[in-house]
Design a protein with these regions (language model features):
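Terminal intrinsically disordered/low-complexity segments used for targeting and assembly
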Residues: 2-64, 123, 147, 231-275, ...
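Small/polar-residue-enriched beta-strand and adjacent coil segments characteristic
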Residues: 45, 58, 73, 80, ...
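Extracytoplasmic/secreted envelope proteins and their assembly/folding machinery
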Residues: 56-59, 73, 83, 172, ...
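Post-signal peptide N-terminal segment of secreted/secretory-pathway proteins
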Residues: 63-85
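Periplasmic alpha-helical coiled-coil/stalk elements that build and connect Gram-negative outer-membrane
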Residues: 139, 148, 155-269, 380, ...
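Glycine-rich cofactor-pocket loops
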Residues: 208-212, 368-379, 414-417
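Hydrophobic, well-ordered secondary-structure elements that form the walls
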Residues: 307, 335, 352, 359, ...
Length: 458
């Protein structure tokens, strides 16, 4: 026994200097010094900044019934269970077994001693233990990889929650904007229809020829087509929102009347973006897992050192177990050095290194994409803010012109056509402003999501 123990110890010492240390992950891409627009990034309760209670209700409903969130959380639980399994790989294994053996020696065996029964019955009960010493850090690397998988699964679930909230908010503002556009189109059709009826009466009275009637009918028909397109856009936006929150087809959605506020979201500091976005944290965790698994693959090249032993009782017959049965035990340290496996370990190591390269590339792509998403949202917000300000000034000027035209009409200084043109211009400006207002709020949601929505890994 001492000779075997000494041999195992010498083998362990011979390979002790070969233990693998996982390589550090590559550095992230260089972050820009600053984004094109300063300001604090959105906080965790960013949705409340819009001042829309209906939006908050929709978010709560979506989180309760989203299959994407349920899938992400199930994968998170799976990763936690796999971590427990990986941690158990470094612990001793203990089992309890029993055996009942009956044997009979043939009388044809001439060497069978006389006076000894040819049939024997043996019963044994034994506890067996085995423990593979993690000298080279293989099991530790597997545990590190599993722990990184848990972090990646948690961050992925957080990203799913953020993406769901952003999409619900975006679709809700799209619904509100489409409803406003439909209201404008319905008003336009009603106006065109009244104008057509007025022209019909004028033509019937013989005051004008039929040419204006053809133009009026064409304008009314086009307004009806536009109204139908508006209804389709409302239906499409509402159906998309229903699917996201788990509502049944045709189920009524909230009828919000209060205007949604425009939050002053910023982008924060670029260097902090890596810590604020759960998808970037998940990509970094997957890279950590790949590095740890490369360490486990390298450890497969080194010998495994295992301690096995058993202890128990043996009796003949079985009734003597515990009543004078003979005890036995054994302890067997062993060293297993792999020599030839047709290139399996080399292939596994090469695959592990390729996974590191792939994970690093995905991480770099995610970081660069995050910077681009923030800058795109900032650029869109700047442009939409200018458009909203300009369109609001145009609408104010058109309304002033309409008021003046109506005053002149009452004073007999203008005709009805001047007022009609001013009303059409006012409706067009109001419709354009509505488009810009709701698109700007959708882009604000995009910026909140691009900057992490106030997420923290803590």
């Amino acid at each position: 026994m001492r000779r075997v123990n000494k041999t195992c110890l010498l083998a362990a010492l011979a390979f002790a200097g070969c233990a693998h240390e996982p390589a550090p992950p590559p550095a992230p891409p260089a972050a820009p010094v600053a984004f094109s627009q300063s300001g604090a990034a959105a906080e965790a309760r960013w949705a409340e900044a819009f001042g829309d209670p209906a939006l908050l209700d929709l978010l709560a409903r979506a989180r309760r019934g989203s299959p994407d969130l349920a899938l992400a959380r199930a994968r998170q639980r799976e990763a936690v269970a796999l971590l427990r399994a990986a941690d158990a790989g470094d612990e001793p294994a203990l089992s309890l077994g029993a055996v009942q053996e009956a044997s009979r020696i043939s009388v044809a065996n001439g060497r069978f001693p006389p006076g000894i029964p040819r049939r024997t019955d043996v019963t044994a009960v034994a506890a067996k233990a085995s423990w593979e010493l993690d000298v080279w850090g293989r099991e530790a690397a597997k545990s590190q990889a599993a722990a990184a998988d848990v972090r990646a699964a948690k961050f992925t679930a957080d990203q799913a929650d953020l993406a769901l909230a952003a999409e619900v908010a975006r679709l809700w503002f799209a619904v509100r904007g489409a409803r406003e556009q439909l209201a404008f189109l319905e008003t336009e059709f009603a106006t065109r229809f009244r104008e057509m009826e007025l022209v019909e009466r004028t033509v019937a009275a013989g005051l004008v020829d039929s040419d204006p009637l053809s133009s009026a009918k064409l304008a009314a028909a086009q307004a009806k087509v536009d109204e139908g397109l508006g209804r389709r856009r409302v239906a499409a936006a509402e159906n998309a929102l229903r699917a996201l929150i788990g509502a049944a087809p045709g189920e009524p959605l909230p009828l919000a009347r209060a205007p949604a506020a425009m939050p002053a979201f910023g982008a924060g500091v670029p260097s902090e973006l890596l810590l604020r976005r759960p998808d970037l944290a998940a990509a970094a965790a997957r890279l950590d897992a790949a590095v740890a698994r490369e360490g486990a693959a390298r450890a497969d090249f080194y010998p495994s050192i295992t301690l096995t032993g058993q202890a128990g009782w043996q009796a003949d017959p079985a009734s003597r177990i515990g009543q004078g049965a003979a005890g036995f035990w054994s302890l067997a340290p062993s060293v297993d050095l792999p020599l030839f496996d047709a290139g399996r370990r080399e292939a596994n190591l090469e695959a592990a290194r390729a996974r590191i390269d792939g994970s690093a590339a995905e991480w770099t792509k995610a970081v660069l994409g995050a910077f681009r998403e923030v800058e795109d949202a900032l650029a869109d917000l700047r442009e939409l803010a200018q458009q909203e300000e300009l369109t609001a000034r145009v609408l104010a000027a058109v309304r002033e012109r309409l008021a003046n035209a109506e005053a002149r009409l009452r004073a007999g200084l203008a005709n009805e056509s001047e007022v009609t043109v001013a009303r059409r211009d006012e409706a067009l400006a109001a419709r354009t402003l509505s488009l810009v207002v709701w698109e700007r709020r959708q882009v604000a949601v995009r910026l909140a999501a691009a900057t992490g929505g106030g997420w923290s890994s803590k």
